[in-house]
Amino acid sequence: MKKIKKIFYQGSEGSYSESVLEACFQEAEYVACETFKETLGNVSSEDFALIPVENSLVGTVIEAYENLTESNLEVYLEIRKKINHALIGLQGAKIENITKVISHPQALQQCSNFLEGLKIERQPVFDTAGSVMSLLENDTKEIAAIAGEHFENDKRFTILQNNISNHIENYTRFFLVGKEDPEMSETKDKRSAVLIADDKPGSLLQGLKIFEELKLNLTKLESRPILGSPWEYKFYIDYQNESNEVDTQLEEELRKVTKEFKIIGKYGSIDL
């Protein structure tokens, strides 16, 4: 296994991404970035990045996935983490006095049922942990943030309500991406890819039939518009496979019936 020295991540100290890094890569240096574009753009031949790509409640993290597919980076590991959101205020704050909640857009979506019950203003910001730290700058007990329950150990803040996600089974998938395989997982039985169908009837269906013929199980199929090409779409695909020979056969067959097919990752999984 290659030693990982530096990992870039989107967010700030105390974020879910940082908690994943601390659990899996204790010896690496962590570098916080404000945007996914910056996070992925900083990766050199010896560095890596960790990005959240999908949540079990609200789906794909579009900005992360878009930037990943436009980069020349590959996915080398999937990490799945259970997410426990909490409503957090400054020490002494009371939930009945809260008038506004701030957090990352994904966190606000994942807790929408709870927030609708409060009937208060919601303000999206770039990071869950950053939203908590901004409470110190605002210095008001009428604003709360949504982030991880691990802030309960910080005496500057108080947990106003635990477990506020729309469903207790709330998980996020993270990808470790880079330019060289760190060889962290012995079994690489998952694939992520991007497919662009030809602009003719039946192209997508023909492509999907090839997966069936090769007995490959699709676990994700999601369409996204192609920027600059109105009404044309690309498809994010995940499928199960651990044979490079089958991947090669798949690519050869798909080139005959689609405009583009690119595998962006061959990886295994870790559950936290």
Regions found by a protein language model. Give the residues of each.
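Domain-level signature for soluble enzymes in the chorismate/prephenate branch of the shikimate pathway
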Residues: M1-L272
